[in-house]
């Protein structure tokens, strides 16, 4: 705390540096928050959902033709009648040929149909096997016919080839009675490639999940058909991405100490959900890099700015230190009044230097006058001393001749000396009073000039504040235009929202944009009202400032008048002091005349020895006083000589 109070430079550097660092820190924090929101809006709400929706569209487009083809097989009336009639072996080859043609036409892995009555399972190669409820491999068939579902899509291992395939099965009914199941199997190559090729960041994944939570297709083959979604994401996150209608669903979860974002998008009419998981560290990686880069740049800017602050503080403090050094040098005894500060600056430091130089000039002039006066005093004392010495010699010779009238001459001599001494003291006092009055008048004149300059500055400041009030008034017109624009924008956004509502599903996106525009317009209007209120307060403050400055200007005018009256009074006092000084000189002249008369009397009463002895004693005392006075004059000259002019 003591160091803080002793150094203005440290105060400037610390305060300005703290303000600079705080400003940069606020900017970095605002940038980080804004970038985080922008990342969420673009990547989480736009880019990633768009990628998932594109994959869903590709999957639905990939399965569209096979679904139609499988439905055609199940809807074949000849096949339906043949299964209902008991599967005549003579007609079996033509249906096998039909399955072969359907397989080739749709590039299927296999085509099939099975009878619910006999359990016979046919593919393009003929009768493959007989299904049984007791066989675990046939559980899919009986589970499907027992479910009553119109269509069954499943990923399973083909019994004939042992390869993983996507099976699409439809019910074959005749007159409302289930007679069989027909469909086809597709190779998983293209679908698996589509799932594996998904890339969002370095570790982003996408996989297909059945509505019961079983993962059907996963980039890691060990998860496909063997792992529940709840095991992969956690129960809460799995529930979040699997429920919620036909729109995109999102949830966040942690795994192995890392945060993930999970998104789920249902596949229309397929009872599957496309699920994607992406580490949050990869979503926000570029944002974190941008924040670090911004922080580094902000730190570099802060260091450079702090260096500039240090240089600026040193430049501001250097002239003050020069003034301090000069004052310390004068006060320590060096007395160098010839030193001057650089007053070329036009700012407050230049004013300080000019004022200090004027102070030194006035002190130099005053001390010069004192030196001149002390020299004259020393010469006068020497002359008086010489006169006293001569008088002592004459008084010795006159001692025997002045004995007869010693008493009378002694009384007269004392009286004359008292009058002379008093007259000299009065003359010296009046001269000192005159000098002090002249100095006081000069000080008052400088005060008048300073007050007049301050009055002019206050007038200029009042004009500047008035101009500021006029400029603030012009801002009201701009705010009125902004408010009008925001109201028109709000009206246009409302019309756009109405038109978008009329457009139905096609205008839903445009309605969202229109609603955002209306929200922005309302915020603009509220901000405009707040700015207008602030401007009104600013106008009131400017008016108060103008009134205060005008009152201050009037007060300084009164001060100028009072100072002028004081100067006039001091001038009158100076005149009176000069008159008193003239009267003292007349008294001194009269005293000198009386002293001459006394000398004549002394010459007349040379025989009176007592008066001569008294006169000799007084002359000796006067000699001693003159010696002491000469010593004081020498001391004064020596002390004043310590100043360098």
UniProtKB/Swiss-Prot annotation:
Subcellular location: Cell membrane
SMART domains recorded: HAMP, MA
Any one annotated GO CC term: plasma membrane
Residues in Methyl-accepting transducer domain copies: 373-609
HAMP domain mapped to chain residues: 314-368
GO biological process assignments: chemotaxis; signal transduction
The UniProt record lists the keyword Transmembrane helix: yes
Cache domain ranges (all copies): 51-276
InterPro entries: dCache_1, HAMP_dom, MCPsignal_dom
Membrane topology: Multi-pass membrane protein
Disrupted-gene phenotype: Mutation abolishes chemotaxis toward xanthine, guanine and adenine.
Keyword Membrane part of the UniProt annotation: yes
Key words of the record: Cell membrane, Chemotaxis, Membrane, Methylation, Transducer, Transmembrane, Transmembrane helix
Transmembrane segments: 15-35, 291-311
Family per record: Belongs to the methyl-accepting chemotaxis (MCP) protein family.
PANTHER family referenced in this protein's UniProt entry, alphabetically: LYSOZYME-LIKE PROTEIN-RELATED, METHYL-ACCEPTING CHEMOTAXIS PROTEIN MCPB
Function: Chemotactic-signal transducers respond to changes in the concentration of attractants and repellents in the environment, transduce a signal from the outside to the inside of the cell, and facilitate sensory adaptation through the variation of the level of methylation. McpH is a chemoreceptor that binds and responds exclusively to intermediates of the purine degradation pathway.
Protein name per Swiss-Prot or TrEMBL: Methyl-accepting chemotaxis protein McpH
Organism: Pseudomonas putida (strain ATCC 47054 / DSM 6125 / CFBP 8728 / NCIMB 11950 / KT2440)
Chain's gene name: mcpH
């Amino acid at each position: 705390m003591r160091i803080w109070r002793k150094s203005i430079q440290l105060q400037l550097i610390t305060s300005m540096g703290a303000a600079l660092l705080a400003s940069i820190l606020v900017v970095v924090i605002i940038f980080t928050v804004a970038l985080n929101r922008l990342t969420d809006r673009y990547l989480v709400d736009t880019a990633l959902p768009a990628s998932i929706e594109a994959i869903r569209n590709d999957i639905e487009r990939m399965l569209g033709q096979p679904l139609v083809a499988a439905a055609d097989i199940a809807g074949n009336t000849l096949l339906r009648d043949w299964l209902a009639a008991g599967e005549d072996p003579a007609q079996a080859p033509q249906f096998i040929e039909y399955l072969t043609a359907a397989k080739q036409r749709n590039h299927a892995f296999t085509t099939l149909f099975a009878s619910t009555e006999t359990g016979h399972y046919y593919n393009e190669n003929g009768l493959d096997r007989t299904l049984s409820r007791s066989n675990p491999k046939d559980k899919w068939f009986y589970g499907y016919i027992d479910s009553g579902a119109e269509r069954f899509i499943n990923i399973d291992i083909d019994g004939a080839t042992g390869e993983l395939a996507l099976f699409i099965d439809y019910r074959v009914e005749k007159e409302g009675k289930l007679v069989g199941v027909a469909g086809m199997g597709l190779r998983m190559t293209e679908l698996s490639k589509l799932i594996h090729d998904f890339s969002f960041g370095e570790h982003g994944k996408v996989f297909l999940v059945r509505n019961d939570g079983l993962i059907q297709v996963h980039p890691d083959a060990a998860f496909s058909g063997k792992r529940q979604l709840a095991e992969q994401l956690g129960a809460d996150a799995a529930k979040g991405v699997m429920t919620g209608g036909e729109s995109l669903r999102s949830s966040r979860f942690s795994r192995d100490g890392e945060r993930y974002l999970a998104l789920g998008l249902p596949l229309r009419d397929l009872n599957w959900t496309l699920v994607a998981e992406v580490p949050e560290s990869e979503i926000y990686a570029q944002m974190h890099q941008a924040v670090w880069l911004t922080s580094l740049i902000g730190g570099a800017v802060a260091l450079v700015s702090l260096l500039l602050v240090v240089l600026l503080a040193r430049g501001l403090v250097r002239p003050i230190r020069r003034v301090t050094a000069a004052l310390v040098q004068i006060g320590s005894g060096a007395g160098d009044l010839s030193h001057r500060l650089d007053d070329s600056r036009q700012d407050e430091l230049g004013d300080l230097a000019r004022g200090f130089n004027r102070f030194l000039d006035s002190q130099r002039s005053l001390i010069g006058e004192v030196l001149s006066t002390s020299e004259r005093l020393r010469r006068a004392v020497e002359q008086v001393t010489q006169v006293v010495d001569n008088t002592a010699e004459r008084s010795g010779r006159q001692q025997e001749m002045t004995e007869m009238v010693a008493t009378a001459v002694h009384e007269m001599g004392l009286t004359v000396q008292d009058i002379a001494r008093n007259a000299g003291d009065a003359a010296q006092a009046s001269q000192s009073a005159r000098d002090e009055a002249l100095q006081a008048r000069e000080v008052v004149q400088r005060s008048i000039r300073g007050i007049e300059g301050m009055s002019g500055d206050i007038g200029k400041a009042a004009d500047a504040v008035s101009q500021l009030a006029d400029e603030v008034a012009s801002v009201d017109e701009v705010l009125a235009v902004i408010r009008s624009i925001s109201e028109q924008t709000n009206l246009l956004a409302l019309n756009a929202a109405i038109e978008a509502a009329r457009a139905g599903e096609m205008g839903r996106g445009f309605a969202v944009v229109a609603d955002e525009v209306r929200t922005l317009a309302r915020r603009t209007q509220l901000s405009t009202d707040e700015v207008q209120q602030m401007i009104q307060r600013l106008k009131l403050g400017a008016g108060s400032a103008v009134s205060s400055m005008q009152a201050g200007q009037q007060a300084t005018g009164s001060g100028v008048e009072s100072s002028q009256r004081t100067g006039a009074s001091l001038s009158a006092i100076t005149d009176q002091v000069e008159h008193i000084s003239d009267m003292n000189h007349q008294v001194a002249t009269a005293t000198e005349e009386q002293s001459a008369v006394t000398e004549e009397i002394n010459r007349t009463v040379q025989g009176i020895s007592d008066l001569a002895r008294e006169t000799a004693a007084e002359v000796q005392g006067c000699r001693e006083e003159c010696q002491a006075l000469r010593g004081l004059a020498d001391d004064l000259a020596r002390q004043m000589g310590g100043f360098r002019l």
